[in-house]
Amino acid sequence: HRDLHVRSRRQRQMCIRDSLGAVDSQMSKVKKELDDHDVVFQPGLNEDLAATALWGSQQAELRGEGLFDGVFGLWYGKGPGVDRSGDVMKHANMAGSSTYGGVVMAMGDDHTGESSTVLHQSDFAMIDASIPILSPAGVQEIIDYGLYGWALSRFSGLWVGLKVMKDTVEATSVVDGNIDRVSFSSPPYVKPEGGLNIRLVDQPVDQEERLVDYKIEAARSFAKENNIDKCVWKGGQNPKIGFVAAGKNWLDLVHSLSLLGIDEKDSERLGITTYKVGQIWPLDTLSFESWADTLDLIVVVEEKRKILEGQIKEYLFDNSKGRRVYGGKKQGVELFSSKFALDPVEIAEKIGYILEEEGCGSDKLLSNLYYVVNSRKAENTSEIASRIPYFCSGCPHNSSTKIPEGSRAYAGIGCHYMAQWMDRDTLGYTHMGGEGANWIGEAPFSSTGHVFQNIGDGTYNHSGIQAIRAAVSSDVNVTYKILFNDAVAMTGGQGNDGGLDASRVVAELNAIGVKKVVVVYDEKEDVNFDLFNPSVETYERSELQNVQKKIRNEKGVSAIVYIQTCAAEKRRRRKRGKFPDPDKRVFINTDVCEGCGDCGVQSNCVSIIPVQTELGRKRAIDQSSCNKDFSCVKGFCPSFVTVEGAKIKSKAFGEILLPELPDPVLPKIHGTYNIIITGVGGTGVVTIGAVLAMAAHIDNKGAGMMEMAGLAQKGGAVHIHCRLADNPEDISAIRVATGEADAIIGGDLVVTSGSKTISLMKESRTQAIVNSHEIVTGEFTRDTDFFIPNDRLKLSLEARLKDAVSFFDATDLAKLTLGDSIYSNMIIFGSAWQKGMIPLSYKSIKKAIELNGASTELNLKAFEVGRWAILFPIEAEKVYKSRVTELPKNLQERIKFRETHLKEYQSDRLAKRYIDFVSRFSGTFLEDAVAEGYHKVLAYKDEYEVARLHTNTISKLREEFDGELKITYHLAPPVLSKLGNDGRPIKKEYGYFM
């Protein structure tokens, strides 16, 4: 929701934003340059207010007060923002754009619902407001069509929609940024008296007349004059079959024809012509008729609800030539579905059969069609394991979304939406800004007397306060839990518009009549309570459950403002030195740990990981991902210690003594070379894609890269599609199709072995290198027995690729050589390059890593470690297994280990007692269970045993950390500890003297 004003005849540009990813953060980085060029980048707060501000920008010169001849503006927002802006869109479009201004609305559509609560198609909202729609195919056309859109807006007096989708707007591509590469001319169109642009004094009836009688036709005329729609393949002298598509579907169509082996020369022979539409509404029907004149069959390739097909059929309805039009249906049977989205393989299958029916079924086409049909079967591969998004390590929502037993809660828009799959009695949500208003309608008819409603500070600021006011007016019993995490976390961690802070939220809630407002805060953060009214009740976050139990009994609307900074934003700020970084780390002594999982229950933290020991599965802290929230320490377990002065230990890079590494034979590119990068959100996967694309640019190759993540930045699955070509024009759709992957850089075994990735692989074509480390999923926080079936996942990849897949533990290798698992993806990348899987030069990759600018030296080292690891796998294995405990290989070794353990625990006599008892069951099916169970009975961990086991804590710490270590034990001795309000013993801190 921001708005944009640039200069032409002393024009100014204004940009008002909605949350279209990182546009605003990028704009903020170049604020000086924008200011120098009269570009105003301005918060819009929410989408409809942003659009209203742009409406105002078109009026700047109407009263003779304008500082510039005109202002041209850009609004950008996702589909939900388009929907909520419908009223202002109609008003502003009826009023019109200014003569030297113009407005473009970039609408981010999510056809597949990967990062939205509904599957969005905004086209019909635009059409309903009579706003023309441009549909760019690729990054270059976003620039070109944006410029065209402003020119069209000025000429026609209409606002103009620019449809952007994941395949275009979330893609990386090499483009020509010179705006002089495109130019536009005005058609000889006769306008009414007074023109088509905005007027100071105007009447609704007159506005409608201009819109219906002139403006829409002016848009068609402008499209024809500037050839926005183009015939790409002419199809010879007398083409009979024509394919029509626009935007993302145009890229899909080009790709699908390639899959069928049809090139432009074949199209001439077969009489196939293609038509690329740029302005999808209103369609330039005169240009279309000229193209379609000789055709017998027109196939409209279009996903979702049909826009082009309807216009084409309406135009051809009275046509006597009898041309057939296939689109959503073919002779009454579904062809291109209105559900979900289309992909090149699906399109290739459908049009392949059509061409065969139309007599174009050459041996080559039929052979390729057979392959396409069979490759689609791979998409039905069953999932062995999956990785869903989850709260980050140390995320405030880990604590804030917990509710007392007997209560229930609603989710909403934001990261807390994920609480719905975390067993937190949280189900149901609304659109942004409606949080809690659903309860107004449900409450009178429900036996439930009270609910909690989660809402983030970004949503509150955007529109959520209106829902709270509505709840106050209705006097329903609801407690709003407002997380103030100081960041709009879902869209990149931006700050709240208008400088909103927690004290203002509390003051506003009191002012609108919320009956009780309390503040719960993270005691580790420096909250300035001088800004709050002294009467406000404040509690540390450990009291949250008790606060909720009390407040749910309040009548009417109440609120808890929960203050804790977003974990991802904390991490970013700490790297920049702008947030306190406690000199403290959490460590679990695995000898003391019993693997009960209560630490995961208390913290819901994905930095708690499993570790196999001789005595079973225990817990450990992943120091690389830990965000120092320390909630895990509350687990009812004496194994936790915190340590100050600790620096993560890693072997110095030189200790590996890398030999001089030979250069690999790089693969040749035939058409395109397709690379898939997989991994876990937040672990640097996107960085690898960015480096690849930049290296290709440095090597003078074409490159297209697209991130397919959705909520994956929150710990879910990430897929990066990267296509390389010797010539940029050889790249159509960036999304790699089924069976088309040449190389897989597998940063995570779960994601790489998933059906979405495996379907892209083809034996004899695809090579893969995969990180074999068990990167746990969020499921482990709730299920103590959860494990990732690594062996089965590896087998599934080997079944598909045979010997063309390699595995090694890049995570542990990164930790032990570079001190942080974040470099594991770069290590896998280095291995893939050394194995001859990446058609880019070493020099270009090195330069791309340097240009990326993030931890340059360590990333370069990681790349070299990866090269070394694939050439010297035995030596690499010795490194990454150096801290792995050698487990007993059979039952007799397990019994022997437990015998030794009992001697250390107490005495030889106790050990003999154990052996004597177990021997009674030797050779029976009970022997294994008795050997483990009886040992647990004898080696009971009382206070004395815990103390004995903690005597080796310092040596265990020395294995993982360097520095002058100051240890604190976190214990709840039965005699000394008190019970908290939640009935759990309160842990106390004890120094090393213990």
Task: Mark where each language-model region is.
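Active-site cofactor/cluster-binding pocket
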Residues: 82-84, 500-503, 508, 516, ...
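Single conserved hydrophobic/aromatic residue that forms the stacking wall/gate
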Residues: 1-12, 16
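Small-residue-enriched alpha-helical segments and adjacent helix-cap loops
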Residues: 893-994
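Iron-sulfur cluster-binding cysteine motifs and their immediate structural context
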Residues: 564-565, 569-576, 594-651
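Thiamine diphosphate
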Residues: 20-154, 165, 401-402, 408-490, ...
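Conserved thiamine diphosphate
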Residues: 109-159, 165, 190-199, 203-204, ...
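Conformationally flexible catalytic loops at phosphate/diphosphate-handling active centers
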Residues: 156-235
